[in-house]
A protein has these predicted regions:
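Multi-pass alpha-helical transporter architecture, strongest
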Residues: 2, 120, 124, 212-224, ...
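Helix-loop boundary and gating motifs at the non-cytosolic
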Residues: 2-87, 96, 252-293
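Substrate-agnostic recognition of the 12-TM MFS/MFS-like secondary transporter fold
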Residues: 39-57, 77-93, 109-113, 139-223, ...
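Cytoplasmic membrane-interface "Motif A"-like loop-to-helix N-cap segments
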Residues: 97-112, 173, 311-326
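C-terminal ends and interior cores of transmembrane alpha-helices
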Residues: 108-130, 323-341
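Short hydrophobic/alpha-helical segments at membrane-entry points of transmembrane helices
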Residues: 131-140, 254-256, 343-352
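Flexible cytoplasmic inter-helical loops of multi-pass small-molecule transporters
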Residues: 222-242
Length: 433
């Protein structure tokens, strides 16, 4: 597609006039906005689908169950994914800032993720039991560390190439197209694989995700990025000192990290939705296809709305998402007491869908807020500090499940609702960007 057609498509999608607004990016970068916008959209759509095909919350537990991996290792999937992607970021952000072009710090990690999934696919076909679980967790750890590095670079590249006020729409469009692709994949799983998922299906899902990551890397490599400032390259010790200095002096950064940590209650609650729903309506709830379809529909429904909302006020969006999460959790807590006709697979799927919508809103709002409020020259450090502290919180949050063991699933869900109530109060302290 030539540049004129790209510009027309970009102007139509973003409601941009003849005089393009290029708030917070250079004049040279402004000329490349349409092409870069669509490259990021299609790159993101592929990665969104890949993330759903091999997910610690859906398909990987299925794989572990099929391979006979001990249950204790299954519980380590989400902590390994989150901690692996978040904790190392503070130590590599300075390395990224030492380079004028940051896109390669997304491209190379994406290829590492592709090869990690490729190796995982062959583990699925050739091992089982404890050894399979350990190998997959190891590969997931490598995948997650690469993801963390790419996350830093992505925010920097977006800030350099997409105007402020259009970033939320771009992120939402990625998620929408990815949601459509996910929906198609979920429907196929639900209709074509009725009960047990054989190894060839799981192998195919993992190989497909690997290919999608490789294609996404190729697309991202084509982004036209202007050279950026390279000041600020430091040792990890200096990085820690500077990060701590920012944390101490910037009260808005502290409040944001606290708010983001509390919003983690939304994804943390989702597995307990699955467990409680399965207890109430039977094993049909555990259908991988239903869960994947719910994720796809949620992204299709929520992303366009969330994108425009986040561009208007990502702060208010965080508050709104927390309120939605509270309401949905309270409804789920009441689910066991519903009448026989209401308590079924379809009503549960709807509650799960709302939870996924809320999670999508939480992710988009905090990403947009951080990109918009962080100072340009220190953005990577702000992102790295935020992600590292959230990674530490995730490790702690892995122990929250003891509440469910001691007091039951509904008390566990009420605990998460309390966290979201605190998130609303914390969100009110944030300044507008």
């Amino acid at each position: 597609m030539n540049s004129e057609k790209l510009s027309k498509a970009y102007n139509f999608i973003t409601d941009e006039g003849e005089e393009r607004s290029c708030k917070a990016i250079s004049e040279a970068a402004c000329k490349e906005v349409p092409g870069n916008y669509f490259k990021k959209v299609f790159n993101g759509a592929l990665t969104k689908l890949a993330e759903q095909l091999v997910s610690p919350g859906t398909t990987l537990p299925w794989i572990f169950s099929t391979l006979g991996v001990p249950g204790g290792l299954t519980g380590a999937l989400v902590p390994v994914k989150d901690a692996g992607s978040l904790l190392p970021q503070l130590f590599v952000s300075a390395k990224i800032r030492a380079f004028e072009l940051r896109k390669w710090f997304w491209v190379i990690p994406a290829l590492v993720q592709a090869f990690s999934l490729l190796a995982m696919a062959f583990v699925i076909m050739n091992t089982d039991g404890l050894s399979a679980g350990i190998l997959i967790l190891l590969l997931l750890g490598i995948f997650s560390i690469a993801s963390g590095i790419a996350s830093l670079a992505f925010k920097d590249v977006v800030a350099k190439t997409i105007p402020k006020g259009k970033r939320g729409q771009m992120l939402a469009m990625r998620a929408t197209i990815g949601g459509i692709l996910t929906l198609i994949a979920g429907v196929w799983l639900y209709t074509s694989v009725e009960s047990e998922y054989n190894l060839w299906v799981l192998f195919g899902l993992t190989i497909s995700a690997s290919i999608l990551w490789a294609l996404a890397a190729i697309i991202f490599a084509g982004i036209r990025e202007e050279k950026g400032a390279t000041e600020g390259g430091k040792t990890p010790v200096k990085e820690l000192k500077d990060a701590w200095a920012f944390f101490k002096k910037d009260i808005n950064l502290r409040n944001f990290i606290f708010t983001r940590a509390l919003l983690m209650a939304i994804p943390l609650a989702q597995p307990f939705f699955i467990i409680l729903g399965r207890q109430e309506v039977g094993s049909e709830v555990s259908s991988l296809g239903i869960i994947v379809v719910a994720a796809g529909i949620a992204n299709i429904i929520s992303s366009p709305f969330w994108g425009r909302f986040s561009d208007k006020s990502s702060r208010k969006m965080m508050i709104a998402v927390a309120a939605l999460g509270i309401i949905n959790i309270l409804v789920m807590v009441s689910f066991p007491f519903w009448g026989g006709n209401l308590k079924n697979i379809y009503t549960f799927s709807f509650l799960l869908l709302i939870q996924v919508i809320a999670h999508g809103g939480a992710r988009l709002s905090r990403k947009t807020y951080l990109v918009d409020f962080a100072p340009d020259k220190d953005r990577s450090l702000y992102v790295a500090l935020s992600n590292t502290l959230i990674g530490l919180f995730t490790v702690v949050a892995a122990g929250f499940g003891i509440i469910a063991t001691l007091f039951g699933l509904q008390i566990m869900l009420l605990f998460y609702a309390g966290m979201l109530a605190a998130a609303i109060l914390a969100g009110l302290t944030l300044r507008e960007t």
